[in-house]
Amino acid sequence: MFKKSLIAVASLLAAVGTAQACSTLVIGKAVSETGNIIVAHNEDNGGRLFNMQHYVPPAKHKKGETVKFEKFAAEIPQVEETLGFYWTQTFVPDGASFADGFFNDAGVVVATNWCGEIFDADRMEVKDGGIGYGIRRLVAERAHSAREAVDIATKLLAEFGYFHDGRTYTFADANEAWQLAIHQGNSWAARKIHDNEVVYIPNNFMMDKVDLNDKETWRIEPKQVERAVKDGRHDAKNPIFNWRKVVAQESVRHERWNANRNVLAWKFLTGVEYNDPEKFPYSAVIDRKLG
């Protein structure tokens, strides 16, 4: 598993310097030239910074030990044993809670895209300050697969809540890739990326056609659907839940700095020029191999 995932980590640890904004591309193994899942990610952060690389070895922890990642965030109970992991750190004077990437000893890759600007009315209370950076770090320390990464992250969200506006997390191993879109509080949707698909996301929520009946491909925080029905953003009779439309205003979904990247990416990947932001795909099945 470790060797098969090396191409993923090579892409994940791409240099920051020339990026204009964060983007993530996931290529399923059936449409990858290597036969492996490929995760390509660039991390864009402005100002002066260092992009440092580390290896953190596996560790054993004392019973009752806790971890705290931001001064204002919740203390999280630590597990007894944690995995070793490679860590690409965006180091800035004031700290960067949402920029680091990871590749652990189980072959799990973690990368994220900022997806903010949610509806003000949707903000929720969080427990003891909530969790932010801890999601990625604890997944890197604990997850033995991409699917388990989703389980770990969503359990943390259920207990503490997310204090940031929102992000989309990409988790991949040698066999599966998943994306987890997190909205502030405890609102989220998770999608398994199929082997014959490609997914591209810039810095806005892209998940749209959440099939509430497809439990193998999709997972969603159930109370979010209830809230959307109550708010008039979703018809309870419709089994397809348009996640990005529910969580983000139209002006955010149409922002040009994201839309322009979507146009270019999907034209390259599919040969189709999408100009209407409401019609940008979340994923696509393609008939050629990429690498």
PLM region descriptions:
Residues F2-Q20:
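Gram-negative bacterial Sec-dependent N-terminal signal peptides
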Residues R142-E148:
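Short, charged, surface-exposed loops that flank catalytic or proteolytic processing sites
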Residues C22-G132, I152-L290:
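A contiguous strand-loop segment
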Residues R136-R142:
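Short, well-ordered beta-strand elements within core beta-sheets of diverse protein domains
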